[in-house]
Amino acid sequence: MPELVFFSGTMDCGKSTLALQIGHNRSARGLQGVIFTRDDRAGEGKLSSRLGLVTEAVEAAPGMDLHAYLVDQMSKGGKVDYLIVDEAQFLAPEQIDQLARVVDDLDLDVFAFGITTDFRTKLFPGSQRLIELADRIETLQVEAMCWCGARATHNARTVGGEMVVEGEQVVVGDVNRPAAEVGYEVLCRRHHRRRMTSASAYAAAISPDVLPVTSA
């Protein structure tokens, strides 16, 4: 039976790499798929991983009807055996509903990959709808690590190396951006709550100890 499967995890846990691997394995068996993505770090219409792998994809723009797009492709003779959706957290809830229709009405497997929560620990609307509708939810087994060595469970947005907790939910950035730019870092819950990034921890580590002042 076709399924809607949601592969979730923090940044840096290999979601896009797994998406590319699933596509490779299926294409090696003669199957043809459609890849959707939104706001990939490599640019519009690209699916990329941090390992340097990149492939062409269809940009799932806001307001785009994903189900209608596939019906149109298939009615023109296009062969579609499965669907891969990367950065699924950025999709609107109604687009997730369309993915469920693809599974139920077109009998296609849909593999969606995304981050569950944003930098404020709030669910992305797309991820929330996937949790509500998916036949299966898989947590990625490659664990991202906080700077302290603990398992990273939270995504932090940084500006100049400092963690911020206000702003637009979606700002495209990366974990490898220069410190002065908007970037992201994965943290354990403890250090996310304390707003302690690797940069702030390093600054604290090299700060000279303040000696107590005593009166003569």
UniProtKB/Swiss-Prot annotation:
Cellular component aspect of the GO annotation: cytosol
GO annotation terms (biological process): DNA biosynthetic process; thymidine metabolic process
UniProt keyword terms in alphabetical order: ATP-binding, Cytoplasm, DNA synthesis, Kinase, Nucleotide-binding, Transferase
One function term, GO molecular function aspect: thymidine kinase activity
Keyword ATP-binding among record annotations: yes
Active-site residues from the entry: E87
The keyword ATP-binding appears for this protein: yes
Domain of life (superkingdom): Bacteria
Enzyme Commission number(s): 2.7.1.21
InterPro entries: P-loop_NTPase, Thymidine_kinase
Binding residues annotated for ATP, in chain numbering: G9, T10, M11, D12, C13, G14, K15, S16, D86, E87, A88, Q89
Family note: Belongs to the thymidine kinase family.
Name by which UniProt lists this protein: Thymidine kinase
Species of the source: Streptomyces avermitilis (strain ATCC 31267 / DSM 46492 / JCM 5070 / NBRC 14893 / NCIMB 12804 / NRRL 8165 / MA-4680)
Taxonomic placement: Bacteria, Bacillati, Actinomycetota, Actinomycetes, Kitasatosporales
Gene label: tdk
